[in-house]
Amino acid sequence: MKLTCMMIVAVLFLTAWTFVTAVPHSSNALENLYLKAHHEMNNPEDSELNKRCYDSGTSCNTGNQCCSGWCIFVCL
């Protein structure tokens, strides 16, 4: 009986601890999404959705041009 009560208290404590530590990270999540979406509406050229990348086999200069991120004279 005591072990069961201790287990229940431990689970409740860990659940509460999870919620307490998660609040600062999730409280601004919607606000950050709104600000990012608002910025992308004001600057559509800077939107991540407009970024182009090269398919494999296409010549490249740097890895950030390739969709895979790997560039050795051609996108891998």
Swiss-Prot record:
Signal sequence bounds: 1-22
One Gene Ontology term, aspect cellular component: host cell presynaptic membrane
InterPro entries: Conotoxin, Conotoxin_omega-typ_CS
Propeptide residue interval(s): 23-50
Disulphide linkage map: C53-C67, C60-C71, C66-C75
Keyword set, alphabetical order: Cleavage on pair of basic residues, Disulfide bond, Knottin, Neurotoxin, Presynaptic neurotoxin, Secreted, Signal, Toxin
Coiled coil region boundaries: none
Organism superkingdom: Eukaryota
One GO molecular-function entry: toxin activity
Places the protein is found: Secreted
Tissues in which the protein is found: Expressed by the venom duct.
Family in the record: Belongs to the conotoxin O1 superfamily.
Domain comment as written in the entry: The presence of a 'disulfide through disulfide knot' structurally defines this protein as a knottin. The cysteine framework is VI/VII (C-C-CC-C-C).
Function: Omega-conotoxins act at presynaptic membranes, they bind and block voltage-gated calcium channels.
Protein name, per record: Omega-conotoxin-like TeAr94
